[in-house]
A protein has these predicted regions:
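Conserved loop-alpha-helix segment in the C-terminal half of the alpha/beta-hydrolase fold
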Residues: 65-115
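Broad hydrophobic/π-residue packing in well-ordered secondary structure
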Residues: 22, 28, 86, 117-118, ...
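Short amphipathic alpha-helical patches
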Residues: 46-51, 98, 123-127, 139
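Catalytic active-site module of serine/aspartate enzymes centered on a nucleophile-bearing elbow/loop
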Residues: 106-139
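Generic recognition of cysteine residues
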Residues: 28, 39-40, 85, 92, ...
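Alpha/beta-hydrolase
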Residues: 2-76, 80
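Aromatic-residue hotspot detector
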Residues: 23, 69, 93, 134-135
Length: 139
């Protein structure tokens, strides 16, 4: 369904919506239960206007104002310490995360097993330990 949408430019319909839901469950969504971190359970204020303007109406083929934005050659201009965290099953592939880590001076990359785009949820306790250790280096 996603390939069909990319080929036809039609990102609508129940089959496409179901495929996107499955994709997001595999690579992004987090569970919400009684043990979920507070950041996952508090009320959200969200909208799609800026996302659609910048990226476009779908996750897979950028058509918005950022579609031609390229920043890889500018990553070395980041001068503050940077912590890059990603999951093995992340929307941000390990290749993308490693590219950032390799090009941002004074950066550290953590690739979490058993984690998706929301590694701060999927590996919450481990994430907090690593984040505090990293922050203490620069405080």
């Amino acid at each position: 369904a996603i390939n069909h949408a990319l080929e036809t430019g039609d990102f609508t319909g129940e089959v496409y919506d179901a495929a996107v839901a499955e994709y997001m469950d595999r690579y992004c969504n987090y569970w919400i239960g009684e043990d979920a971190p507070e950041c996952c359970t508090r009320p959200k204020k969200s909208g799609s206007e800026s996302y659609v303007e910048g990226w476009g109406p779908n996750e897979f083929a950028p058509t918005g104002t950022l579609k031609d934005f390229e920043y890889i050659d500018k990553l070395d201009q980041i001068k503050i310490p940077s912590l890059i965290c990603s999951g093995i099953s992340d929307l941000c592939s390990p290749l993308v995360a490693k590219t950032m880590a390799d090009r941002i001076p004074n950066s550290k990359w953590i690739l979490w097993e058993r984690a998706r785009h929301t590694c701060f949820v999927d590996r919450h306790d481990d994430y907090c330990v690593e984040l505090i250790k990293w922050m203490n280096q620069y405080d």
